[in-house]
């Protein structure tokens, strides 16, 4: 896996502009921040973000992959201002779950998600080198 950074561009903080990888592909559905019983333990965006990331990792583990294999994330939030106000809290959450992997990412604000209580939903693409 190789992070792509065009010459002269500043290094982005918390993500990569692009990733080049080859191998076995794994795609997740949109994953929300509920537990294995489909219960939201947190009604805060940061708590749901942490659980959604843990859920993504649990899915990847089913095919012998982990956070280091994630090459792309699309993060959907219902309130981008809330997300931005929690950046200081989200950074340590990210590090504790994802380590120092910073995939290509998009952050998209949506009116609402299918699960009414969900504040965040994450789709992931992972590549496991073979």
Segments from the language model and where they lie:
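N-terminal presequence-like segments and the immediate start of the first folded domain
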Residues: 1-71, 77-130
């Amino acid at each position: 896996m190789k992070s792509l950074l065009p010459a002269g561009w500043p290094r982005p903080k918390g993500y990569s502009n692009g990733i080049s990888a080859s191998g076995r592909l794994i795609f997740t559905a949109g994953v929300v921040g509920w537990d294995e019983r489909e219960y939201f333990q947190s009604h805060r965006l940061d708590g749901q973000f942490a659980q959604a990331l843990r859920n993504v990792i649990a899915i990847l583990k089913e095919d012998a992959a982990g956070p280091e294999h994630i090459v792309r994330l699309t993060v959907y939030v219902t309130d981008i201002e809330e997300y931005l106000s929690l950046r200081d809290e989200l950074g340590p959450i990210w590090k504790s779950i994802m380590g120092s992997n910073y995939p290509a990412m998009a952050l998209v604000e949506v009116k609402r998600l299918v699960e009414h209580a969900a504040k965040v939903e994450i789709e992931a693409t992972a590549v496991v080198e073979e």
